[in-house]
């Protein structure tokens, strides 16, 4: 009888823990959703647009940072609308040097007034992300998979902001995003789309 009671307690605790984990990523106060849209394959990887949406109802982000761990030995060849904070060791490359060879890169937004040829839509706001707004950047990833079967989602994703701590769930492969051209006469779709959901944890 005592053994049965102990088993029931353990099951209740596990269920409660799962409930907390589920609720944490479906907060009534909204969340930060980060979407990776893979747009083109390259000889050694892909080009993607990464967009962060602030679905929080009342919390503004004063300056975001994103980081993740590559599941292969990926490098970031170049970026538009954002930059990595460190290049890392790229000594194995000759001639064309990647922007970052760091296994877990950290990315920050560019400043307003960035030259137009370094921008994309919804970038360059110093990382400020107001409720209901979005921020985006483009990156070219190399030494990565270049097909639906071989491209790998980022792991250990982190979204940070000054005096704000967030908890991010795992990357998920979702239905590819559809895009409408400016003249509204053509619809295209991403090759693949990955989603990461992050929720506010506490002020720091």
Swiss-Prot record:
Disulfide bonds: none
The entry's keywords: Glycoprotein, Signal
Signal peptide: 1-24
Keyword match Glycoprotein: yes
GO biological process, one term: cellulose microfibril organization
Summary of the tissues where the protein is detected: Expressed in roots, stems, leaves, flowers and siliques.
InterPro entries linked to this entry: COBRA_pln
Highest taxon, organism lineage: Eukaryota
Residues bearing attached sugar chains per UniProt: 31, 195
One Pfam family, short name: COBRA
Keyword Signal attributed: yes
Cellular component terms (Gene Ontology): membrane
Family classification: Belongs to the COBRA family.
PANTHER family attached to this UniProt entry: COBRA-LIKE PROTEIN 5 (PTHR31673:SF39), PROTEIN COBRA (PTHR31673)
Additional observations: COBL5 appears to be a truncated member of the COBRA family due to an in-frame mutation that introduces a stop codon. This truncated gene is actively transcribed.
Protein's UniProt name: COBRA-like protein 5
Provenance organism: Arabidopsis thaliana (Mouse-ear cress)
Designated gene of the protein: COBL5
């Amino acid at each position: 009888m005592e053994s049965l009671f102990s088993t029931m307690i353990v099951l209740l605790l596990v269920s409660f823990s799962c409930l907390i984990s589920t609720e944490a990523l479906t907060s009534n106060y909204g969340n930060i959703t980060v979407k990776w849209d893979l747009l083109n394959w390259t000889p050694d990887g892909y080009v993607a647009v990464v967009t962060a949406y602030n679905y929080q109802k009342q919390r503004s982000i004063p300056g975001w940072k994103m980081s993740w761990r590559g599941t292969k030995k990926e490098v970031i060849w170049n970026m538009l609308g954002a930059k990595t904070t460190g290049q890392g060791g790229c000594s194995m490359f000759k001639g064309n040097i990647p922007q970052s060879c760091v296994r877990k890169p950290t990315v920050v937004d560019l400043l307003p007034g960035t030259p137009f040829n370094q921008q994309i839509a919804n970038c360059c706001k110093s990382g400020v992300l107001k409720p209901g707004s979005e921020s985006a950047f483009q990156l070219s990833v190399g030494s990565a998979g270049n097909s639906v079967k071989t491209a790998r989602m980022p792991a250990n994703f982190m979204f940070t902001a000054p005096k704000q701590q967030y908890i991010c769930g795992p990357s998920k492969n979702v239905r590819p995003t559809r895009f409408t051209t400016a003249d509204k006469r053509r619809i295209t779709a991403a090759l693949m789309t990955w989603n990461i959901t992050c929720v506010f944890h506490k002020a720091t």
